[in-house]
Amino acid sequence: MNNKCIYYVEGPCEQQLIAALKEAPERLIPGKIKVFNVVQNLIPKSQMLSIQAGTTVVLVFDTDVPQTSNLKKNLELLTRYCGKLKIIFLPQVLNLEDKLVRCTDVRTAMELTKSGSVKNFKTDFCKMKTKDCRSMLERHKLDYARLWMTKTPEAYYSWQVESIYDSNFAHEF
């Protein structure tokens, strides 16, 4: 396996979270982040052809839509066009705000960014510099191991993640 990694995340808030967790000291594997909804859209063939065999592909996706056909098709296409990959699933069961509240010492996500509303929180969170975001998460005692530990809805059982640090959670194809 090579040491390349690509993260496919649903939106800018997930992009910010992943980027912050990759800051030193790294809590996630370093790699490139692409904003792309793998549950609702098919990864373009041109992108897949640029992924080298042995790359770790991390799929961060929401589970609020019970339709998983595009996710399954993306997995088929990744294995067809990219050769041997390590694919890691990080399904998000709660919305980002709830997830951060569950994993930090705050009662509301707005406390993290001192925002006046949930909408402002998302805007403020996404606009933060990556290092500032990481510092804010550390200051509020983010428990990294709890981020992706919530049980997924039934439609997503195939992609259940017990722990991001559990060596058995990666699916190799």
Language model region names:
Residues 2, 15-30, 45-58, 65-173:
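C-terminal accessory helical subdomains adjacent to catalytic cores in phosphodiester-
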Residues 6-10:
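Short hydrophobic beta-strand that contains or immediately precedes a catalytic carboxylate
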Residues 11, 63:
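Residues immediately flanking
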Residues 34-35, 39, 59:
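Conserved helicase/translocase motor-coupling segment
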Residues 41-43:
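N-terminal polybasic phosphate/anion-binding patch
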